[in-house]
Swiss-Prot record:
Similarity field: Belongs to the protein disulfide isomerase family.
InterPro entries per UniProt: ERp29_C, ERp29_C_sf, PDI, PDI_thioredoxin-like_dom, Thioredoxin-like_sf, Thioredoxin_CS, Thioredoxin_domain
Protein name: Protein disulfide-isomerase erp38
Protein's organism: Neurospora crassa (strain ATCC 24698 / 74-OR23-1A / CBS 708.71 / DSM 1257 / FGSC 987)
UniProt keyword annotations, A-Z: Disulfide bond, Endoplasmic reticulum, Isomerase, Redox-active center, Repeat, Signal, Stress response
Record has Zinc as a keyword: no
Amino acid sequence: MVLLKSLVVASLAAAVAAKSAVLDLIPSNFDDVVLKSGKPTLVEFFAPWCGHCKNLAPVYEELATALEYAKDKVQIAKVDADAERALGKRFGVQGFPTLKFFDGKSEQPVDYKGGRDLDSLSNFIAEKTGVKARKKGSAPSLVNILNDATIKGAIGGDKNVLVAFTAPWCGHCKNLAPTWEKLAATFASDPEITIAKVDADAPTGKKSAAEYGVSGFPTIKFFPKGSTTPEDYNGGRSEADLVKFLNEKAGTHRTPGGGLDTVAGTIAALDEIVAKYTGGASLAEVAEEAKEAVKSLKNSAELKYADYYLRVLDKLSKSEGYATKEFARLEGILKKGGLAPAKVDELTVKVNVLRKFVEKAAEEAKEEL
């Protein structure tokens, strides 16, 4: 009976160990797993009797689980440095727990000196590897985590970049965090906009904070496309305030939550021409004028949307009621929901353009009622 009980306990222990997402390291596998694998690895040197190690254990396991989807890009591992003292000595471990980051290219690790909470550890991994932890029950963050080594590569190019310089202990930063996540999600479909964050209190972020004049937290800076000189953001910190700011600066037409406003995709010069048609002008004359106007457009985005104006005019030449029917059809599809964000954007732009063709008729119908 005692033997059976021992076997059951051993089996349960083995099952628990098998489920762990944290890699166990010993002298015989350390070099192969950490130094020769080419994969960045965070290693905890711990002792079973250490109270701080016991407190860290569930957080460390959660970190490993949140990164398990990217195990080909980053590893979370641990060493019982009380049992394997040679390994601890090899890497200068003098207390427990000690966390060291190996970049997969060098035998010289970087000491982790941040907090032992999940957010701090996750942010550290994101800064070092670009891999973001997937927290249980939530989608991966769309905020771009930057540091001293990566911020230069993120600004000055073909993107407008909005950066929040924060500190883990800052209460206002914690209040901003969920709004910042929403903002990143709102602009996720806009390739020319990046929503980013720098832990300006971390050793890997202090240089950037000093360079860009950060003296308090949070500090928000806007780097326009093609510029490495930031503009200070001093407006409100609600999603609506931040969305409005980015729309004005980047020429986007987002609404809080990620939708597009009623102007998105429309072109003022073509709207004036369409107004002549809805006002009673000849369709053939309007279509010809629109084609000439399109030739003068130089913005690539405008040219893309201009094609749809011309397509609608062509359809109208074959069916007078096309714009009204297509407007109603696309609005119905949008109301049903269940579409991918890119498809929602595409249909919203078409509805906005079609509205220019039908709004005169809609106004007249209201007047008759």
